[in-house]
C-alpha cells in the first residue's frame, strides 16, 4: 500500500506527540511504501525549529530529530516539487481555497498526491482542513490523531 505523508503527520515520527504511535506503525510496516513531497524536508526542519524556539524540545532533542530525519528521509519515495505540482496546487486553491480554507503548502502536498495516487493510495495528515479536502477529492485519509 502506498502512503503519502504531509509534514503534519511526518513530524510525529521524529517527535513524540499525539499520533506518534500510529505514524510509527504506518511507516515501519514493510507492506507500506512511504511517499512525501520534496517540500516536506523544508517544512519538517521549520517545524522542528519552531518547537525548539517554543521550548517544546531542547537542543539535544533537536539534534536527534534532525539526524534521525535525514537518515530516514533517504528511505522515502520523494516526489519532486516542480511546475506540474505547482499548477495542480493552484487549481486546488482555486477550487477549495475560498470554500474549504485550503492553504498554499497543503495545496502543494495534495497536488503532488493527486498526480501520483492510484486506487490503493492513502493520504496521511494530521491537518483536519487538508484531510477534509482530500476526502472531498475522493481519496482515503488517515489522521494519526484520530482514535479510530
Predicted regions mapped to residue ranges:
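Short, well-structured N-terminal submotif of metal-dependent ribonuclease cores
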Residues: 1-40, 51-64, 148
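Acidic, PIN/NYN-like endoribonuclease modules and their adjacent C-terminal/linker elements
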Residues: 2, 115-148
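Alpha-helix capping/helix-boundary segments
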Residues: 10, 40, 85, 109, ...
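Alpha-helical elements of the RecA-like P-loop NTPase motor core of helicases
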Residues: 21, 46, 87, 131-132
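Active-site-proximal, substrate-binding regions of enzyme catalytic domains
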Residues: 39, 46-98
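Active-site neighborhoods of divalent-metal-dependent phosphate/nucleic-acid chemistry enzymes
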Residues: 76-126
